[in-house]
């Protein structure tokens, strides 16, 4: 670990269409091989489809979907005296968003729809309705934390 100073987190530029930092982060997570314009067109197309389905604005629809996928607790491995325990810890707000977006993108990539924009739109609408693979992932993480509640005193 460096001993000098802690490097601050980089500021992310808000996306050009909606001016949202959250959406810019979502585009960056979806981006593959530095193709940002492709990622932007996929996200904007998916949000447009989602907004038409839900009757809300694009950003509101995205926020609802993310809210249903954000984890509140997760487990971290902690080695104590030769055995490893899965210790439940609370998730920081920045990490909550990052995990939710990552899980939605992963779930969308695994879907079998035609285009990525359609897959993403379907996964986001499923997440908004509290169903789908990304929501299931959050439930699994919460269940794991609940099962290991007995080891919570090992928190650091």
Curated annotation (Swiss-Prot):
Example GO molecular function: tRNA binding
Keywords on record: Ribonucleoprotein, Ribosomal protein, RNA-binding, rRNA-binding, tRNA-binding
Listed InterPro entries: Ribosomal_uS7 (IPR000235), Ribosomal_uS7_bac/org-type (IPR005717), Ribosomal_uS7_CS (IPR020606), Ribosomal_uS7_dom (IPR023798), Ribosomal_uS7_dom_sf (IPR036823)
GO cellular component entries: small ribosomal subunit
Any one biological process term the GO annotation gives: translation
Domain of life: Bacteria
PROSITE patterns with a match to the protein in the record: RIBOSOMAL_S7
Pfam families membership: Ribosomal_S7
Similarity field: Belongs to the universal ribosomal protein uS7 family.
Subunit structure: Part of the 30S ribosomal subunit. Contacts proteins S9 and S11.
Its job: One of the primary rRNA binding proteins, it binds directly to 16S rRNA where it nucleates assembly of the head domain of the 30S subunit. Is located at the subunit interface close to the decoding center, probably blocks exit of the E-site tRNA.
Protein name: Small ribosomal subunit protein uS7
The species this protein was found in: Shigella dysenteriae serotype 1 (strain Sd197)
